[in-house]
C-alpha cells in the first residue's frame, strides 16, 4: 500500500542540498508499490521523477510532479561456485555500504568504487567509475520495470550498452526504472592499481582490503563530505577526444594529464583543466569549485539551482576559451515538471 505525501521538502534527499519542494512524493519499497505508484501518477496526469540517492541530480525549487523515492532493500545469493558469486541487490541499498559488505565477504571487484555516493539502483545509469574501474564490468543483469511495456524484465550487461558514464538508461531515461541489480564478483582478487597514485598508496600490501582502505582515504582527502560541503561528487565528465585533437592540444599544453582510450581516443583530466583555468577554490557567491579538488562543485551557502547553473556555465565558458574543449556536466538537470532538460537550458 503506497503512502502519498504532498508538498515534501527534498533538501535531505539531494546531496547538493538544494531547497526543493515536490507537490507529490511516495517512498517505494517494493516492485508492487512501484507499479501502484506509477498507476497513481497516470491517473493524476503527473510526470514521475525517480529519486535514488539524489547524488547525480540538479533539481528546481518547485517540482509539480510525483517523486518516487526508490527504497527497495535486500540481497539474494543467486549462484556461487569456487571462483565467483552472483548476488541480486535491491536498488535502494546504499552503494558504499554494499561495497564494504562485498569486501568483508571476500567478494572482489568493486573496491575501487568505494565511497561513491548514491544507491545501488543508480550505479548502472551512468556506469559509475573511479580509479580505472567501471561498475559495468561486474554487472550481470539489471532488473527493471519497463514503463513502455508495463512489465518487469531483466536486461543483460551487453544490452545495457555500457560506456564511459553512459548506458541505455540514459538513452531511454523515461522507459526503465531499476529495481534490483545482479552483480558477478570474484573470490580471487584482481587488483587494478594503474590509476593515479593508487599503486603508491597501496604499497607492498596489495590486498583488496588495503586497496579499498586507500581508495577511501584518497577520496576523503580530495573530496568534500556532502554533509559538510553539499556536492554531487565530480561535477564534470572527463572529455574524451580524438588522438589528432589531443596531439594539437599537447603542443600547447605538454603537461596535460591524459589516459589512452579505445578507438584511438584520449581521455583528458577535467580537474586539471579547471585548475589551469583558475577555478580551483574559486567561488561565485554561494557556489564554487572545491579548493582540494577542482572537479567538485560545492554549495557553500543555501544556493539555488540558478546559482549552480550560473557557476558551472562560467566554468564551461572559461575552459572552452582556454582549451577549445567543452566540459559536460555529470548530473542530470530537471525542469519543474519533473522531466529532464538539456544542460544548456
From Swiss-Prot:
State the species of origin: Acinetobacter baylyi (strain ATCC 33305 / BD413 / ADP1)
Specify the protein name. Answer: UDP-N-acetylenolpyruvoylglucosamine reductase
KW Cell division (keyword) present: yes
SUPFAM superfamilies cross-referenced by the UniProt entry: FAD-binding/transporter-associated domain-like, Uridine diphospho-N-Acetylenolpyruvylglucosamine reductase, MurB, C-terminal domain
Catalyzed reaction equations: UDP-N-acetyl-alpha-D-muramate + NADP(+) = UDP-N-acetyl-3-O-(1-carboxyvinyl)-alpha-D-glucosamine + NADPH + H(+)
The superkingdom of the source organism is Bacteria
Family note: Belongs to the MurB family.
- Please name the pathway: Cell wall biogenesis; peptidoglycan biosynthesis
Q: A GO BP term, please?
A: cell division
Its gene name is murB
Location relative to the cell = Cytoplasm
Q: Which cofactor does it need?
A: FAD
Amino acid at each position: 500500500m503506497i503512502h502519498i505525501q504532498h508538498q515534501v521538502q527534498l533538501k535531505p534527499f539531494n546531496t547538493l542540498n538544494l531547497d526543493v519542494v515536490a507537490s507529490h512524493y511516495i517512498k517505494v519499497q517494493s516492485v508492487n508499490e512501484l507499479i501502484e505508484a506509477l498507476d497513481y501518477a497516470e491517473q493524476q496526469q503527473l510526470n514521475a521523477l525517480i529519486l535514488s540517492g539524489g547524488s547525480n541530480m540538479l533539481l528546481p525549487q518547485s517540482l509539480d510532479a510525483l517523486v518516487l523515492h526508490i527504497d527497495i532493500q535486500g540481497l539474494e545469493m543467486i549462484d556461487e561456485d569456487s571462483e565467483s558469486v552472483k548476488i541480486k541487490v535491491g536498488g535502494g541499498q546504499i552503494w558504499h555500504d554494499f561495497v564494504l559488505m562485498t569486501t568483508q565477504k571476500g567478494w572482489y571487484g568493486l573496491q575501487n568504487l568505494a565511497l561513491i555516493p548514491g544507491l545501488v539502483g543508480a550505479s548502472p545509469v551512468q556506469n559509475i567509475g573511479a580509479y580505472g574501474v567501471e561498475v559495468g564490468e561486474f554487472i550481470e543483469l539489471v532488473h527493471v520495470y519497463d514503463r513502455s511495456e508495463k512489465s518487469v524484465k531483466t536486461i543483460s550487461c551487453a544490452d545495457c550498452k555500457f560506456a564511459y558514464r553512459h548506458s541505455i538508461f540514459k538513452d531511454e531515461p523515461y522507459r526503465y526504472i531499476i529495481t534490483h541489480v545482479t552483480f558477478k564478483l570474484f573470490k580471487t582478487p584482481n587488483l587494478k592499481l594503474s590509476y593515479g597514485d593508487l599503486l603508491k598508496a597501496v604499497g607492498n600490501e596489495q590486498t583488496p582490503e588495503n586497496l579499498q582502505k586507500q581508495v577511501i582515504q584518497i577520496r576523503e582527502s580530495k573530496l568534500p563530505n556532502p554533509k559538510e560541503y553539499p556536492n554531487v561528487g565530480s561535477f564534470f565528465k572527463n572529455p574524451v577526444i580524438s588522438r589528432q585533437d589531443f596531439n594539437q592540444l599537447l603542443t600547447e599544453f605538454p603537461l596535460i594529464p591524459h589516459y589512452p582510450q579505445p578507438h584511438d581516443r584520449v581521455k583528458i583530466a577535467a580537474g586539471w583543466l579547471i585548475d589551469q583555468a583558475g577555478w580551483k577554490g574559486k567561488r561565485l557567491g554561494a557556489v564554487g569549485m572545491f579548493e582540494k579538488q577542482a572537479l567538485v562543485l560545492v554549495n557553500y551557502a543555501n544556493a539555488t539551482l540558478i546559482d549552480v547553473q550560473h557557476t558551472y556555465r562560467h566554468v564551461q565558458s572559461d575552459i572552452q576559451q582556454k582549451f577549445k574543449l567543452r566540459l559536460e556536466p555529470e548530473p542530470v538537470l530537471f525542469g519543474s515538471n519533473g522531466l529532464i532538460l538539456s544542460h544548456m537550458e
